[in-house]
Amino acid sequence: MRGDERIQDEMFSCVTLEQRVPADHPLREIRGLTDAVLGSLNAEFDALYAASGRPSIAPEYVLRALLLQAFYSVRSERQLVEQLDYNLLFRWFVGLSMDDAVWNHAVFSKNRDRLLNSEVAQRFFAEVNRLAKRFMSDEHFTVDGTLIQAWASQKSFRPKDGSDDDGTNFRGQKRSSDTHRSTTDPDARLYKKSYGKESKLSYLGHVLVENRNGLIAAAMATTADGHAERDAALLMLHQRQKRGSQRVTVGADKAYDTEDFVATAHELNVTVHVQKNEKGRRSRIDRRTTRHSGYARSLSRRWLVEKTFGWLKGTGPLRQVKLRGLAKVDWIFVFSCAAHNLLRLPRLLATQIQQDPQPQCA
């Protein structure tokens, strides 16, 4: 028997958001992990807000919404807030009820900016890594950098001397970051990572990935220049080595095969397993390093860092960052790296349970 189409809406609903979300939905475990991380940041959140005044959007709501933006490739805050209005899964993850009003996108952005001006991203990243510590190697790492296109056009790249060049016709002109600056984003630099590619206004994002499961152990963004990748790698290794004195290995591509990088890494008690660069020069990596099987093994794990960048720039929000200024770009880069690790954790936890099942009582 054919059923009738019912046009009239129900006035009341007896189904909760909790019931709408499947019990085996991947976001359920991520929500639990996220709540544990946010619970450890209460002191940081309290320090950001005045004791009196009009209540803001809860910072927990903002951070959960930003995680959804990374997980589901939502292009803008306007679209994110729009989806929060009608997407029941998004409402459940953020913590809104069926009847809660959704914020205006401009209000959401202002509340997000308050978090951008703090160390919340670094603390969030550190807490996620604390949960993931059992799955992370503390001996073997890979380091690399990637280009992040800035939210600024080529036409905004104008001479620093204040000449009348409006930037609209730059054909045949020689332009560089030494003589020009973007009026839209002064921290962005004209840069390209390889020959044959066009130069773009960009930043550089850097990650230190552990070689066991490909989780991100350290992350930072910098302005784009020819030394930034090696300088950032040494800084991340230095911060990591301050927490432990044991010797570690780090793999990298040919760009890291320089005398200063290798020498400084050795001072930090780091064995450098970089791809040898012998094109017109002598490599700083000799037989004392390459003869060990660990050297080839480190190079074979470099795909882990490329896979990480693939997610950050393909699914995540970092192909072209929609924030301006190095501080904000660094914040969203570190937060996106935390989202990457958070997304990986449920599967790693499930694998551990399968490998180490609980003993059954007699």
What are these regions (language model features)?
Residues P22, P26, G53-Y61, S76, ...:
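Secondary-structure capping and boundary motifs in well-ordered enzyme cores
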Residues G162-G167, K254-A327, W331, I353:
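Helix-centered, glycine/charged polyanion-binding patches within enzymatic domains
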Residues Q79-R91:
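DNA-recognition alpha helix
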Residues P317-I353, Q358-A362:
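C-terminal extensions of enzymes
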Residues D85, V94-T264, N277, H340:
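Polybasic low-complexity intrinsically disordered regions
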Residues A65, L80, N104, V207, ...:
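Hydrophobic, well-ordered secondary-structure elements that form the walls
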Residues M1-A36, L345-A362:
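Charged, often Cys/His-bearing segments associated with DNA-binding zinc-finger transcription factors
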Residues A23-L67, Y72-S73:
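Basic, short loop/linker segments at the boundary and entry of helix-turn-helix/winged-helix-like folds
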